[in-house]
Regions:
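Multi-pass membrane glycosyltransferase architecture that uses lipid-linked
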Residues: 2-246, 283-420
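Membrane-lumen/periplasm interface segments of multi-pass, membrane-embedded glycan/lipid transferases
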Residues: 239-288
């Protein structure tokens, strides 16, 4: 009779070994980088970064070679952290060209995504137990969307700060959570949406203090930027809202079949270009969309009955999805924020299926369908319009379905809220 050695590997031991998961997670992404190194040659971008925004970031970082800096000499549609980071990475890899820049950028995003994996396990363990936390980490590691966007843009950094703020809030470390939410708002505005959950799940005095910390972090940085050059700083707060609609049901109503890309890097030297409308004006004004979203949000706010940790995560998730649904545009990289939150809310086969379907629809639209236009910044026309419309409607249906599921989760049971 054979005896099993203590060194023999079993399925349970393998799947329960977090160090092994980290090794596979990092190793797969590094090997992908080695096999498909990012290059730009003869006017064509190739490698793992092809189809993303890194080459555009590289061109923006190139302004610094002439002494031109973001928020002083050129405007950005994002808060300050992303493009100041771009300048730092450009300067650090100036002699290595685009390949060096893209590889360093991707490695930094890999570090953030590694943090996302660790936070998924930690929060999953807190919400559902150790086994489910480990299972969620494995599922996240196998998701293709976060892997792709490591090499395409800075969305893993946004998701990391959002999850870090949420994890701190779950641990009742509210000051730390507020600080991270404030930092997150300096990357993208979405991490600040956690404020809605704070006001619903914490006493008013604590929520007010939390809000004040977020505002202080955000306001102190923007105060310095406005003092330096208000004209070049203002577009970071307004440009996204001044764009015409794109890749949403709102865009279909407006007859806009284009992406939401801004113009060439050189156009950012003139702040007037931040307000140039490149498509048809909105049939439904932005203020109306915001009003509808606010009404839906207030309805959920008033009807929520679940005040445990699972309810808190569900509330943050539905807030994020409502915001994305009301937005005039859709960006594929938002998957990086959506996927971990949905998995934390629905650690089931249905939850995994939902994020896989959402990812499939998103990538079928971009890059698959957009590449058929011959210009990823171009417009849908002819035979491409029908599949484009179908994909937009399918994605919207999935997001609405997730919101319905989250609302039901928030209505499941009445848990008495207690304050520490």
């Amino acid at each position: 009779m054979k005896t099993r050695s203590s060194s023999d590997l079993t399925l349970g031991a393998l799947l329960g070994d977090f160090r092994l998961l980290l090794t596979l997670f990092i190793g797969f992404r590094l090997l992908l980088l080695l096999a498909y190194q990012p290059v730009y040659t003869q006017g064509v971008e190739r490698g793992v970064s092809a189809g993303g925004d890194l080459f555009y970031y590289y061109l923006l970082g190139g302004f610094s070679a002439d002494g031109l800096l973001p928020f002083r000499d050129w405007w950005s549609e994002f808060p300050p952290i992303p493009h100041f980071l771009t300048v730092i990475l450009y300067q650090a890899t100036a002699r290595a060209g685009y390949s060096g820049f893209a590889m360093l950028y991707g490695l930094l995003m890999l570090a953030f995504d590694l943090g996302n994996l660790i936070l998924m396990r930690r929060m999953g363990r807190r919400l559902y137990g150790a086994n489910t936390g480990m299972a969620l980490a494995w599922i996240y590691a196998l998701m293709i969307a976060p892997t792709v966007f490591i090499w395409w843009n800075f969305e893993p950094m946004v998701a990391f700060v959002l999850l870090l703020s949420l994890a701190a809030l779950l641990g009742k470390r509210e000051t730390r959570s507020a600080l991270w939410a404030g930092v997150g708002a300096l990357i993208k505005f979405t991490p600040a949406l956690i404020l809605g959950a704070v006001w619903r799940f914490r006493a008013p005095a604590r929520a007010l203090r939390y809000t004040a910390i977020v505002a202080a972090v955000f306001g102190s940085v923007y105060g310095l930027l406005f003092a330096q050059n208000a004209t070049m700083t203002l577009p970071s707060l307004t440009a996204q809202f001044n764009k015409s609609s794109y890749q949403t049901v709102w865009a279909l109503l407006d007859g806009n079949y284009r992406t939401g890309n801004f113009g060439t890097p050189q156009e950012r030297l003139d702040p007037a270009n931040a307000n140039v409308l490149t498509g048809n004006p909105s049939v439904i004004p932005g203020i109306v969309r915001l009003g509808i979203a606010a009404a839906v949000g207030l309805f959920v706010f008033a009807r929520a009955r679940r005040f445990d940790d699972k309810g808190l995560v569900a509330f943050v998730t539905i807030t994020l999805l409502i915001f994305f649904l009301q937005a005039q545009g859709w960006s594929p990289q938002w998957l990086v924020q959506i996927i971990p939150l949905v998995l934390l809310c629905f650690p089931t086969r249905d939850g995994v299926t939902a994020v896989v379907l959402l990812s499939a629809v998103t990538f079928a639209e971009y890059p698959f369908l957009w590449l058929r236009t011959g210009d990823i910044g171009g417009a849908m026309s002819g035979a491409l319009v029908t599949p484009f419309v179908i994909l937009v409607l399918a994605r919207t249906t999935i997001l609405v379905g997730l919101c319905v599921g989250l609302y039901r989760r928030l209505r499941e049971e009445a848990v008495i809220r207690t304050e520490d």
